[in-house]
């Protein structure tokens, strides 16, 4: 059925649901609580501000179809692991229209990085890799992404970004609460890969829902290998490999 929300709806209290389409209109709001799933087969239309539809950390907005028919912005919250001041995390956005600097406004503007496939490095002028990463030094990079002020850069769909913690992030392990605002991504998404250099590409989940890794690899078997790599390391920890590896359903930890 087509669902219209005209009052406060919180899945933790009111339950998960599936709808053919979903409209949030005057007087209404939707919160998809942590570990809950809302499934919308077709389009989601939010007639209000992004704060009227919130997908909490570990909450799931699942959609079907091959096209993105969504209109209106929502808020999606995603937490990092417990990280230290000056740690880095790889992020991608589950919505369209989220500003890069607005996502972490107290991170220094020159501490947002893209990955260069041809050099296998992060950064622009003097790059660095993530194997045994401590504090990248020396590091010379323009103020922003590829010379563009970070204030003027939006997350590109399915593209991964390396972002350092805010300058005032605690020195003790603390979760960074990421918040994205924009039109939720849905449907089939195509990302242009590079074959330069080693051929590695930094991509991320573009949806406000999980991706089945085995299905992802099988559906893209003609274009990628069967190995996926996941990076997470704390500054100063050089005892382990920087990347975890998933290969044909087998997972190899870096810990």
Where does each model-flagged region fall?
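N-terminal exported-region signature
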Residues: 1-255
């Amino acid at each position: 059925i087509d669902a219209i929300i005209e009052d406060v709806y919180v899945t933790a209290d009111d339950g998960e649901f599936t709808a053919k389409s979903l409209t949030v209109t005057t007087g209404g709001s939707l919160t998809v609580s942590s570990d809950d799933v809302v499934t919308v087969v077709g389009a989601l239309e939010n007639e209000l501000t992004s704060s009227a539809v919130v997908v909490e950390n570990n909450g799931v907005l699942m959609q079907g179809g091959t096209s993105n028919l969504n209109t209106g912005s929502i808020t999606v919250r995603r937490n990092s692991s417990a990280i230290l001041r000056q740690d880095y995390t790889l992020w991608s956005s589950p919505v369209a229209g989220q500003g890069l600097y607005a996502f972490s406004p107290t991170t220094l503007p020159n501490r947002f990085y893209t990955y260069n496939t041809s050099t296998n490095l992060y950064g622009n002028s003097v790059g660095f890799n993530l194997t045994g990463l401590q504090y990248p030094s020396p590091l010379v990079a323009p103020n922003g992404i590829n010379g563009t002020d970070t204030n003027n850069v939006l997350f590109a769909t399915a593209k991964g970004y390396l972002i350092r913690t805010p300058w005032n992030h605690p020195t003790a392990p603390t979760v960074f609460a990421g918040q994205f605002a924009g039109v939720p991504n849905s449907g089939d998404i195509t990302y242009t890969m590079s074959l330069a250099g080693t051929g590695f590409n930094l991509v991320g989940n573009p949806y406000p829902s999980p991706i089945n890794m085995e299905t992802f690899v099988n559906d893209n078997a003609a274009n990628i290998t069967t190995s996926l790599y996941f990076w997470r390391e704390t500054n100063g920890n050089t005892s382990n490999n920087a990347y975890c590896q998933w290969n044909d359903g087998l997972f190899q930890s870096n810990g």
